């Protein structure tokens, strides 16, 4: 059982981060993922909880109005949404700390991911505050693997594969391993698959099932590449503009959503495998040579992250390793 930490209410960043907005009649919370993926379930749970607490909130899955995780803070600052869910790795250009949870082969279980989350949470909150946002909750993803047109279990099968990755680290790792990798928003994947310009997708069974990737990619290699996070944020001015009861409803719903998301991950892997089998997906394991190739390629990527993340990032990795 993963321990869900009890945490104090987050202090609100100063309103100097942006002009305080007029109190809205209700909030919207967006994610680029489908309603059936675990982040989509999270925004729905949050919306229901906050609404029950007296603040009307509408959940908007599937990338409403072109929303993408990489533009999370811009969307909040522009007032497009009051809150958003974002895949953490997509925010690596804002702060390298957001790449931490998707570093390859760093975590091997939900418990590992939770421990790394606890160590990194203050840094995530501080990075969000610098962007005029408040960290609301975290969502774990099941482990990442390769959705492919043909089985990919050997280095030869990976070589030249046109594969979507979800962040700059994944792109570097898979290129070093011989693939033709590029980082794409998950919302762009279907169009590229339909056009035939993509052979494979780095994602979890959860994300792939949400988009029914088996329509194009009927094989999944269980590489256990990473157990990454999505993070949810609110615009600090929107949160500060609420009356005390409204702020309490948001923060209580966020805490309940965090607990729900980390409890849900426990059975998610088995449930995803069942759905994949029911839809004819072939499940494969990488052979020892491919595992070795990926781990070797990952070492330099992790070292590059360590060098770019500064003392704070290195301290988190050291504490995690200890």
Question: Where do the language-model regions lie?
Answer:
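N-terminal secretory/targeting leader peptides
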Residues: 2-4, 10-15, 21-110, 128-322
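A gly/proline- and charged-residue-enriched helix-loop-helix capping module
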Residues: 111-121
């Amino acid at each position: 059982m993963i321990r869900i930490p009890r945490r104090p209410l987050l202090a609100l960043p100063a309103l100097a981060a942006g002009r305080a907005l007029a109190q809205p009649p209700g909030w919207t919370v967006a994610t680029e993922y489908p309603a059936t993926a675990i982040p989509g379930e999270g925004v729905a749970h949050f919306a229901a909880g906050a609404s029950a607490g007296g603040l009307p909130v509408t959940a908007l899955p599937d990338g409403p109005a072109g929303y993408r995780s990489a533009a999370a803070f811009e969307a909040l600052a522009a007032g497009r949404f009051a809150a958003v869910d974002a895949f953490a790795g997509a925010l690596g250009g804002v702060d390298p700390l957001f790449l931490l949870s998707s570093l390859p082969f760093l975590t091997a279980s939900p418990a590992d991911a939770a421990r790394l989350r606890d160590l990194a949470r203050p840094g995530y909150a501080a990075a969000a505050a610098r962007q005029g946002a408040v960290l609301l909750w975290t969502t774990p993803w099941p482990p990442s693997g390769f959705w492919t047109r043909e089985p990919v279990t050997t280095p030869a099968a990976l070589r030249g594969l046109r594969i979507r990755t979800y962040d700059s680290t994944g792109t570097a790792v898979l290129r070093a391993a011989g693939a033709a990798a590029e980082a794409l928003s998950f919302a762009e994947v279907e169009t590229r698959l339909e056009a035939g310009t993509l052979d494979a997708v780095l994602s979890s069974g959860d994300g792939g099932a949400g988009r029914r990737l088996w329509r194009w990619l009927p094989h999944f290699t269980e590489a256990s590449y990473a157990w990454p996070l999505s993070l949810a944020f609110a615009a600090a001015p929107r949160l500060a503009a609420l009356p005390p009861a409204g702020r309490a409803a948001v923060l209580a719903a966020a805490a309940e959503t965090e607990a729900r998301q980390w409890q849900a991950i426990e059975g998610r892997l088995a449930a995803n495998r069942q759905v994949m089998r029911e839809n004819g997906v072939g499940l494969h394991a990488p052979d020892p040579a491919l595992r070795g190739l990926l781990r070797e390629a990952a070492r330099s990527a992790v070292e590059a992250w360590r060098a770019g993340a500064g003392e704070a990032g290195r301290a988190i990795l050291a504490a995690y390793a200890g």
